[in-house]
Design a protein with these regions (language model features):
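Proteins that catalyze or organize thiol-disulfide redox chemistry
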Residues: 1-113, 117-234
Length: 234
């Protein structure tokens, strides 16, 4: 596009560009600069300024920002719905609330719930621009049991798990129905991303919050949950 604006590329019916006007030159510079900015993304480099509009980092073959924080081995085994969902940044996340909470109780660690969605632009922005931060990723990898719950997933639940919500009276037929009902009934919220920090009994450690694009601030939020958890087990 940039070369076309400069007259270096032409379509069959285009006339010769003998003079490049100032507006055309400015547009060409902007287009070429943006193209150069995006090129590193082909090899997995994070593009934070446009991360909200890009596919999840977990869909890339490799990510240059992954591994920026040391992680410990969890040995948590295969996870329910693990064939459907994939956590970003190599995180050992669960995709079922009860399974994740049971593992947190076993490991005596607090729970980080991420109510998210396939179509959630702000969720992707958090995963691409905040979660890779060294301090944030270290806490998510080592200090919390991460549970990602997709509220818009259309996969049908097993017949035995399909039910009617006591909260809304609506039929819970899909995975998304189940987790959106949990978010609404327990935490009175329906926006994503929505982050909840719990102890091993499922009790709130601190007030839930939504997107926070400041890594330092988000790290402090995670720290506040850790402090509350330590006090609860003393």
């Amino acid at each position: 596009m940039g070369f076309y604006l400069l007259g270096k590329l032409k379509l069959p019916n285009d006339s010769d560009v003998k003079h490049v006007s100032t507006p055309r030159l400015v547009l060409a510079i902007i287009t070429l600069s943006f193209t150069m900015y995006m090129i590193p993304g082909l090899w997995g480099a994070p593009l934070k300024s446009i991360s909200a509009f890009l596919p999840p980092m977990s869909t890339q073959d490799f990510v240059l920002s992954a591994g920026s924080a040391p992680a410990v081995a969890h040995n948590s085994g295969n996870h329910k719905y693990g064939e459907i969902f994939h956590a970003p940044l190599g995180l050992d996340a669960f995709f079922d609330y009860d399974e994740g909470l049971a593992y947190a109780k076993k490991m005596n660690k607090p729970v980080f719930i991420d109510f998210t969605g396939h179509a959630c632009v702000n969720c992707r922005k958090m995963e691409a621009s905040v979660w890779p931060d060294k301090e944030v990723l270290s806490r998510l990898s080592n200090d919390y049991v991460v549970i990602q719950l997709y509220v818009d997933d259309k996969t049908d639940l097993a017949t035995a798990e399909q039910t009617v919500s006591k909260y809304s009276g609506k039929k819970i037929q899909t995975i998304g129905n189940k987790w959106s009902d949990l978010q609404a009934s327990r935490f009175n919220a329906n926006s994503q991303p929505f982050y909840v920090l719990l102890d091993t009994k499922g009790n709130l450690l601190v007030q839930p919050q939504g997107a926070d694009y400041d890594p330092v601030s988000f790290s402090k939020y995670l720290d506040s949950g850790l402090e509350a958890f330590k006090k609860s087990v003393q």
